[in-house]
């Protein structure tokens, strides 16, 4: 069904009065095989067209055209099993494709420019033309994508699974998750107060340090007095003479826990070894150490240095408060959070989440994790049921290693500690569990030796050995 077409396949595109429509102005259907175009303006037109068995091809139709427009407003009776969504096929084909998966982007790729149209307050000839062009682009995208997916070896089953999953997730997005706003505001305020108080304590642990601002020439006016800027420097900075005619301005810098650069500098002084770095830019920038919560907490535990533990605790408080603030910003009028999910958003074909990132909620065992999770509540007379699968990627990896029982046993253990021990025994390298975890997932998702080596602060040659 998904990787073929015949005369039963029709592209469908709907134009309503908003993204949350209460009226459909026009629906255009286009036959994928014959290119026949039909315009439908009301429920009766649709009922006459829909009386035969058809398969409907849409672009984002599992999220908009069918659930928000046709089925609720025209009682279209479309079975989701008969819907093909080219947005899903596009993401499955190439999740991180340049310029994205929009119909406009695909139109550009095929030389079919999407018409610019913005007035959806009333039905116009321009709107109908706009809708027809969208069906033209969608039909071409569909025909191209099924050929490309077949060339890459995708099966009907894989397309079916992704469509069913997208349908379920779209329903999840529409329903949202009930959120305890009152408790969230209280927790947010408590965390911000703790963050502020701890920040003051940290500041006491790190005294100010001198920092050079600039170097200047000492110049005199004709009357023998110095220029005004010199007195301004004297009033504002410490002056260090480097010769009879030049001086440097210096100032004392107070530690600002909110500055990532200052945090990195102080932690490096305390012996912290970074495991993550910013991406390098084409112009040679980037590659700077990043402070991540997991590796810092591990270092705090290993080192026993109080200042490290304090910075780690401050980062947790800051991160949790920022996260709750984001949740509150995305809270709807229905007291629910309707987070967005791209079901094939990552190159690995895993989901990505936004507005807000609901996949990044701290676990119950993490600091303030239970308090954060308790904000997501069930509707009256409903219950929250939690389920998780352990080591899915590791089990898949074991399967491709051969699937023997010893591989499965190995992967079901603490994989990252085992890898840490193996690296130390076989290569003589000290490492952390966090580094080994990062390297393991990077490896199974296709990272090259340079990336593996970078995880441990090493070069690509060592990455190859690891």
Regions found by a protein language model. Give the residues of each.
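Conserved "right-hand" nucleotidyltransferase catalytic core of DNA-directed polymerases
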Residues: 1-15, 20, 26, 126, ...
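Hydrophobic "anchor" residues on beta-strands that sit immediately upstream
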Residues: 9-11, 55-56, 81, 384
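Active-site-proximal helix-loop-helix substrate-binding element of RNase H-like nuclease domains
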Residues: 20-25, 29-41, 54-151, 159-169, ...
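Metal-dependent catalytic core segments for phosphate chemistry
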Residues: 22-26, 386, 393-426
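Short amphipathic alpha-helix with an adjacent loop that forms part of the alpha/beta core around
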Residues: 44-51
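Cytochrome P450 catalytic domain signature, combining two hallmark sequence patches
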Residues: 76-80, 196, 272-279, 401-413
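Short, basic (Lys/Arg/His-rich) helix/loop patches that form interaction surfaces
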Residues: 425-433
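Short, amphipathic alpha-helical "recognition" segments used to contact nucleic acids or chromatin
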Residues: 434-445
């Amino acid at each position: 069904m998904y990787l073929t077409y015949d005369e039963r396949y029709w592209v469908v595109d709907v134009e309503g009065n908003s993204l949350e429509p209460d009226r459909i102005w026009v629906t255009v259907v286009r036959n994928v095989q014959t290119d026949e175009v039909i315009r439908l303006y009301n429920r009766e037109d649709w009922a006459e067209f829909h009386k035969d068995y058809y398969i409907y091809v849409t672009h984002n139709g599992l999220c908009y055209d069918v659930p928000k427009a046709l089925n609720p407003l025209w009682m279209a009776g479309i079975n989701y099993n008969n819907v093909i969504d080219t947005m899903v096929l596009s993401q499955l084909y190439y999740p991180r494709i340049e310029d994205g998966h929009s119909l406009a982007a695909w139109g550009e790729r095929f030389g079919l420019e999407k018409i610019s149209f913005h007035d959806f307050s009333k039905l116009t000839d321009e709107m109908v033309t706009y809708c027809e062009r969208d069906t033209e682009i969608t039909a071409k995208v569909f025909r191209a994508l099924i050929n490309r997916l077949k060339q890459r070896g995708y099966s009907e089953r894989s397309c079916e699974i992704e469509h069913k999953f997208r349908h379920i997730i779209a329903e999840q997005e529409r329903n949202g998750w009930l959120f305890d706003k009152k408790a969230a505001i209280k927790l947010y305020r408590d965390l911000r107060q703790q963050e502020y108080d701890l920040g003051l304590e940290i500041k006491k642990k790190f005294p100010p340090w001198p920092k050079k601002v600039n170097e200047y020439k000492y110049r005199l006016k004709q009357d023998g007095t110095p220029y005004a800027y010199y007195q301004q420097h004297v009033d504002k900075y410490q002056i260090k003479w480097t010769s009879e005619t030049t001086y440097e301005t210096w100032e004392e810098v107070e530690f600002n826990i909110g500055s990532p650069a200052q945090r990195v500098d102080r932690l490096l002084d305390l012996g912290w070894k970074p495991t993550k770095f910013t991406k390098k830019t084409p112009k040679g920038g980037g590659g700077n150490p990043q402070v991540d919560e997991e590796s810092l907490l591990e270092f705090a535990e290993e080192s026993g240095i109080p200042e490290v533990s304090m910075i780690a605790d401050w980062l947790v408080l800051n991160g949790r408060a920022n996260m709750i603030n984001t949740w509150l910003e995305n809270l709807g009028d229905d007291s629910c959070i309707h987070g967005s999910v791209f079901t094939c958003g990552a190159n690995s074909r895993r989901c990505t989440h936004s507005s807000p990132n609901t996949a990044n909620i701290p676990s119950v065992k993490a600091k303030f994790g239970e308090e954060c999770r308790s904000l997501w509540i069930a509707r009256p007379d409903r219950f929250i049921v939690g389920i998780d699968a352990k080591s899915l990627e590791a089990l898949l990896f074991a399967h491709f290693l051969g699937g023997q029982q010893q591989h499965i046993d190995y992967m079901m253990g603490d994989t990252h500690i085992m890898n840490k021990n193996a690296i130390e025994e076989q290569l003589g390298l000290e490492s952390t569990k966090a580094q080994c975890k990062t390297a393991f997932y990077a490896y199974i998702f296709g990272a090259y030796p340079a990336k593996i080596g970078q995880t441990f602060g090493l070069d690509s040659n060592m990455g190859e050995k690891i």
